[in-house]
């Protein structure tokens, strides 16, 4: 695992930057515009720290999958689409999220995972 620390940390940094900026600059304002705030208090109050923890967990899982089967970008997109189906598509269908914030979330998730996988791949060489 120590040999993979550079790609893991790099992917986490890129994913955190994309996720945090996308969430705070696009997703939260879209949720506020439709009057849909957070129904529960956050487990981690600081948005940047929360983004970092989420992305680190996702990248560690991605690293594990890549070590088993390879193909970082493909597996990152499988993870992204899975999250989109479980959260965004389902939440729109059951009325827990408006369409505009869900579409913004889809873009953020795809960019986050693509950026993390690209960085992981480049730093693994």
Region annotations inferred by a language model:
Residues 1-125:
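Juxtamembrane/disordered regions of integral membrane proteins
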